[in-house]
């Protein structure tokens, strides 16, 4: 408050040196002082518009865009649960909802839970993970919606054992699908999901999934000299993660990894040196 008073006096006197020295006041403090709505109130207002089916789709999209910007702040992300807005967000993931709003809902979920243990726990109180998995398994799902849903799932389960356990319980592994002709953006999201899966301890049950889904073979298939650099980098990182978790590669897998490394030898200057060398240790 003292800083705000000093700023006000400097503004009135026109003392530029003092203004520069004091700096700008906290916008939140200005809002409180002059009676502007606080951010939780703005979040509630946005959700009211989003929930209103009589509002135009454009206005609902604008409201969701505003809501998304607000929850990029971690305090506001945590306030989604505090002011009981999660269910409204998750409801917009349903197949009956316009696609653009579903995209926003999945995106907001991913942003809110990313690197945020409290929001990860809060989100799991609802059926949002089941909705996200369902989106990824829809036939002819729009690519943008699938990307946002994969992002949200990855953000939810990364470094969060309880989140992974729920993912496993809901047959989340069903979304880990590799298609050689897939858009590289989708491949990157799936690889990020695999990385998130491996961010928690590799127990026997998880190892069984790795074998059943032929995960190692699918990852190795990405190591191509004409492949997308980002995907190759991520694939190497995942093999490195598996090695760090003391995963036992079969002799045929080790041979295929060695072949993959030869394939991308000329790309060494464009990919992570640490991951490349770590993977080389697997075959030596």
Curated annotation (Swiss-Prot):
Record flagged with keyword Nucleus: no
Intervals holding ARM repeats: 13-55, 117-158, 161-199, 204-244
Subcellular localization(s) per the UniProt record: Cytoplasm
Domain of life: Eukaryota
GO molecular function, one term: adenyl-nucleotide exchange factor activity
UniProt GO BP: cytoplasm protein quality control by the ubiquitin-proteasome system; regulation of translation
Alphabetical list of SUPFAM superfamilies matching this protein: ARM repeat
Residues in the signal sequence: none
Alphabetical list of Pfam families matching this protein: Fes1
GO annotation, cellular component aspect: cytosol; endoplasmic reticulum
Its biological purpose: Functions as a nucleotide exchange factor (NEF) for Hsp70 chaperones which accelerates the release of ADP. Required for fully efficient Hsp70-mediated folding of proteins.
Family, as annotated: Belongs to the FES1 family.
Family annotation (PANTHER family): HSP70-BINDING PROTEIN 1, PROTEIN FOLDING REGULATOR
Protein name: Hsp70 nucleotide exchange factor FES1
Source species: Debaryomyces hansenii (strain ATCC 36239 / CBS 767 / BCRC 21394 / JCM 1990 / NBRC 0083 / IGC 2968)
Encoding gene per record: FES1
């Amino acid at each position: 408050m003292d800083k705000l008073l000093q700023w006000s006096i400097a503004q009135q006197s026109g003392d530029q040196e003092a203004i520069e020295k004091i700096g700008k006041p906290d916008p939140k403090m200005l809002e409180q002082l002059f009676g502007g709505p606080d951010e939780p109130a703005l979040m509630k207002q946005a959700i009211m518009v989003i929930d209103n089916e009589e509002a135009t789709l454009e206005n609902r999209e604008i409201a969701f865009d505003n809501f998304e910007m607000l929850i990029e702040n971690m305090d506001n992300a945590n306030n989604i649960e505090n002011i009981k807005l999660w269910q409204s967000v998750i409801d917009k993931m349903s197949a009956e909802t316009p696609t653009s709003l579903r995209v926003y809902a999945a995106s907001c979920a991913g942003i809110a839970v990313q690197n945020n243990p409290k929001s990860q726990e809060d989100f799991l109180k609802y059926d949002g993970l089941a909705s996200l998995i369902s989106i990824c398994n829809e036939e002819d799902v729009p690519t943008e919606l699938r990307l946002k849903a994969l992002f949200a799932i990855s953000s939810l389960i990364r470094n969060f054992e309880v989140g992974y356990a729920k993912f496993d319980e809901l047959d989340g592994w069903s979304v880990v699908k590799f298609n050689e002709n897939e858009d590289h953006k989708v491949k990157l999201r799936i690889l990020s999901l695999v990385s998130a899966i491996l961010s928690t301890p590799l127990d026997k049950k998880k190892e069984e999934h790795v074998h059943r889904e032929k995960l190692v073979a699918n990852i190795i298939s990405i190591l191509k000299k004409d492949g997308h650099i980002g995907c190759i980098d991520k694939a190497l990182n995942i093999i490195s993660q598996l090695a760090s978790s003391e995963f036992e590669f079969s002799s045929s897998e080790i041979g295929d990894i060695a072949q993959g490394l030869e394939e991308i030898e000329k790309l060494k200057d464009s990919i992570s040196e640490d991951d490349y060398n770590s993977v080389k240790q697997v075959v030596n």
